[in-house]
């Protein structure tokens, strides 16, 4: 039988893995076809960078959620912090569905703006429970900020 903390870590990794899998499923078929044909801004990173970047970010997200949950549901702010985390996780998966699956940079942009706000809220709530957990999400908000600019530029260039 798994210890309570190991069980929590497995659930956190599983939740993040599910979100990333949904995103990957929506993305993988569109990259060599639709996405490759889009006009992109000069600051578009090389395609090979996205996989390692998201892998690291998803790992940090899972560990951050675990650090919050490790405090226990009875600790102040834990339930709210994890609820907001789950909201942003759903929005994260939906971005790939909107942008790549539906091939809609506009829907992706709307989603990523709401996602950005949800990540900021998650960071605030995580900091209140666990400073290391909040710090672990700072690269995530930085990357999503960049991704939002990239999304907006792709929308503008392909209208």
Model-identified regions with their sequence ranges:
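Membrane-interface loop-to-helix entry segments
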Residues: 45-60, 104-115
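N-terminal signal-anchor transmembrane alpha helix
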Residues: 2-26
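Helix-coil boundary and interhelical linker segments in multi-pass alpha-helical membrane proteins
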Residues: 1-10, 66-80, 125-133, 159
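Terminal transmembrane helical module of multi-pass membrane proteins
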Residues: 125-159
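Helix-adjacent hinge/juxtasegments
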Residues: 59-96
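Cytosolic, membrane-interface loops and tails of multi-pass inner-membrane proteins
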Residues: 30-44
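Hydrophobic alpha-helical segments of small multi-pass membrane proteins
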Residues: 82-91, 95, 109-122, 140-145
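Membrane-interface helix caps and helix-loop-helix hairpins in membrane proteins
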Residues: 75, 95-106, 127-131, 156-157
């Amino acid at each position: 039988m798994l210890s309570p903390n190991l069980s929590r870590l497995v659930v956190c990794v599983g939740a993040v893995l599910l979100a990333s899998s949904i995103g990957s499923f929506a993305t993988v078929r569109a990259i060599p076809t639709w996405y490759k044909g889009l006009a992109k801004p000069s600051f578009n990173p090389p395609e090979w960078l996205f996989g390692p970047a998201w892998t690291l970010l998803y790992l940090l997200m899972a560990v951050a959620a675990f650090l919050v949950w490790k405090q226990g549901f009875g600790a102040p702010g834990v339930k709210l912090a994890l609820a907001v985390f789950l909201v942003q996780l759903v929005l994260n998966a939906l971005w790939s569905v909107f942008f790549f699956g539906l091939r809609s940079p506009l829907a992706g942009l709307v989603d990523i703006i709401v996602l950005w706000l949800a990540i900021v809220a998650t960071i605030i709530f995580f900091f209140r429970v666990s400073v290391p957990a909040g710090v672990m999400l700072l690269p995530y908000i930085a990357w999503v900020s960049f991704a939002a600019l990239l999304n907006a530029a792709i929308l503008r260039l392909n209208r």
